[in-house]
Amino acid sequence: MTRIHPTAIVEPGAQIDESVEIGPYAIVGPHVTIGARTTIGSHSVIEGHTTLGEDNRIGHYASVGGRPQDMKYKNEPTRLVIGNRNTIREFTTIHTGTVQDAGVTTLGDDNWIMAYVHIGHDCRVGNNVILSSNAQMAGHVEIGDFAIIGGMSGVHQFVRIGAHSMLGGASALVQDVPPFVIAAGNKAEPHGINVEGLRRRGFSPDAISALRSAYRLLYKNGLSLDEAKVQLRELASAGGDGDAPVAALVAFVDASQRGIIR
């Protein structure tokens, strides 16, 4: 049976699973869908065309599904889609997409979103991502699986942050961070491979060694980006555990529109 506090407002049209819990003074809009066993904290607002999957935990005073902070927005029915088992802590803001992009902001599964985080319109956040307190994502930002964003960091619009990368606290990021790389500073610069994170996630010593070699080619050997990519492609075909992650790094660099941190 759905547990809805008597002071909460659930507008007609909202689709709420019977196992959902909604706390005091929370507001759920008419175009919202909430999946099984999700908990909505007190005073939080879930609005817009928002879909929440199963087993999510929304902290008190969170604002989820609000209008995009884009002056071109004209009340189009753009969306926010959130997966399963996400923790979204107090005072977080997550906005719906815009028609200038795909019209949807997405958050995958098993993410840990700490207090006061902002996820802007059209962002695409993968799975198992950690966004530390007060991390701020501008519109159209992409964050790969298992990335970690330090507290008080600011990320420029359209920036891509690769899988398994890490951005240090209080950083200002204006260009893409390749997968597996640690970045920090204002403005953010590369600081090596995220070795400890890769070990924790089961990457083999050979794969980590290959990624360290890739990092040296990209950042330490004095090569131009085009020269580095030629040698990176050779490294990605060496026939070891490192082939796949190095190939993923090369593909990310090839696809960069804003350029990578250097």
From Swiss-Prot:
InterPro entries, per the entry: Acetyltransf_C (IPR029098), Acetyltransf_C_sf (IPR037157), Hexapep (IPR001451), Lipid_A_LpxA (IPR010137), Trimer_LpxA-like_sf (IPR011004)
Keyword annotations: Acyltransferase, Cytoplasm, Lipid A biosynthesis, Lipid biosynthesis, Lipid metabolism, Repeat, Transferase
Pathway linked to the protein: Glycolipid biosynthesis; lipid IV(A) biosynthesis; lipid IV(A) from (3R)-3-hydroxytetradecanoyl-[acyl-carrier-protein] and UDP-N-acetyl-alpha-D-glucosamine: step 1/6
Subcellular location: Cytoplasm
Substrates-to-products reaction catalysed: a (3R)-hydroxyacyl-[ACP] + UDP-N-acetyl-alpha-D-glucosamine = a UDP-3-O-[(3R)-3-hydroxyacyl]-N-acetyl-alpha-D-glucosamine + holo-[ACP]
Pfam families: Acetyltransf_11, Hexapep
EC number: 2.3.1.129
GO molecular function, one term: acyl-[acyl-carrier-protein]-UDP-N-acetylglucosamine O-acyltransferase activity
Gene Ontology cellular-component annotations: cytoplasm; membrane
Leader peptide range in chain numbering: none
GO terms, biological process: lipid A biosynthetic process
Tree of life domain: Bacteria
Annotated CDD domains: LbH_UDP-GlcNAc_AT
SUPFAM superfamilies per record: Trimeric LpxA-like enzymes
Role noted for this protein: Involved in the biosynthesis of lipid A, a phosphorylated glycolipid that anchors the lipopolysaccharide to the outer membrane of the cell.
Assembly notes: Homotrimer.
Family, per entry: Belongs to the transferase hexapeptide repeat family. LpxA subfamily.
HAMAP family: LpxA
Identification of the protein by name: Acyl-[acyl-carrier-protein]--UDP-N-acetylglucosamine O-acyltransferase
